[in-house]
Design a protein with these regions (language model features):
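Short secondary-structure boundary/hinge segments and terminal tails
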Residues: 56-57, 112-114, 141
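Solvent-exposed, well-ordered amphipathic alpha-helical segments
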Residues: 30-35, 46, 50, 58-66, ...
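General secondary-structure edge motif
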Residues: 17-18, 71, 75, 102-103
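Intrinsically disordered, low-complexity segments enriched in polar/charged residues with Gly/Pro
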Residues: 12, 38, 70, 102-106
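Vicinal oxygen chelate
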Residues: 1-8, 29-32, 76, 80-125, ...
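Short secondary-structure junctions
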Residues: 43-49, 101-106
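Conserved short beta-strand elements that form part of the metal-binding/catalytic scaffold
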Residues: 8-13, 44-76, 119-121, 125-133
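N-terminal beta-strand motif that seeds the catalytic metal site of vicinal oxygen chelate
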Residues: 10-48, 76-83, 129-141
Length: 141
């Protein structure tokens, strides 16, 4: 099975490799750098040497030293993942302090959301979203 961009999509039974919602297989140039990022920066739960749970998503990391880093957020395929928070400014600052790359500082999208972006060591973007329909409040903080 493929998504509209041609990426392989695999449906797995609930609980397979601890996946209960979404599992994302990611190639990384350095498993050591990715492990530091997931463990220390995101403070994700380590399931094994190359598998992490962050909220309801399980990331399955595969080391490939030849993997090209992400250089553009626009294009086909996976470009970023999103995490919902109550205070984007605080979450963004915390992730940057822990080692994430500051990709886009927090800003407000009308009355819909306050968002920002950070990046991992391979340049994969993470959207930090304070969505009004979920948090009720878009004030900075």
């Amino acid at each position: 099975m493929q998504d509209p961009d041609g990426n392989a999509v695999t449906l797995v039974p609930r609980g397979y490799l601890d996946i209960t919602h979404i599992g994302m297989r990611m190639r990384v140039r350095s498993l050591a750098a990715a492990t530091r990022f997931f463990s220390e920066t995101l403070q994700a739960v380590r399931l094994d040497a190359a598998r992490y749970r962050w909220a309801t998503t399980v990331f399955l990391l595969e080391e490939d030293p030849e993997h090209e880093p992400v250089t553009d957020m626009q294009g086909k395929g996976y470009r970023y993942t999103t995490v919902q928070v109550y205070k984007v400014d605080t979450a963004h600052a915390t992730l940057v302090e822990r080692g994430a790359t500051d990709a886009v500082s927090p800003f407000t999208l009308g009355s819909t959301a306050r968002i920002s972006f950070v990046a991992d060591p391979d340049g994969n973007w993470i959207e930090i979203s304070q969505r009004a329909s979920l948090t009720g409040d878009l004030s900075p903080g």
